[in-house]
């Protein structure tokens, strides 16, 4: 489950953003047990709900902020400040889908969204 700002979610859905920038990288599936791609649920900030999902095809680690900016829609200066002297991880965004009906966090056993992201168990009735 990934917390994401509304403007970034819209750019992912529009195909304009193919890297989602984070300070840490996911493993394929919880505890590395599932193969890639990794299913990522998108909690959109301010909505109180999961609005959709995308496939994370893998990730890149880089401190070349111009490269990351070109694929993430985030200005290089902002990325450099966010990185704090370290490399960042670009989660490679694959196929994205917006749900017809948003899913409240409570459906996933959560009372609040993660600060950045976290692994969760998906209820059986939510799996495709």
PLM segments and residue spans:
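Structured alpha/beta reader/binder surfaces that contact nucleic acids or chromatin modification marks
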Residues: 1-128
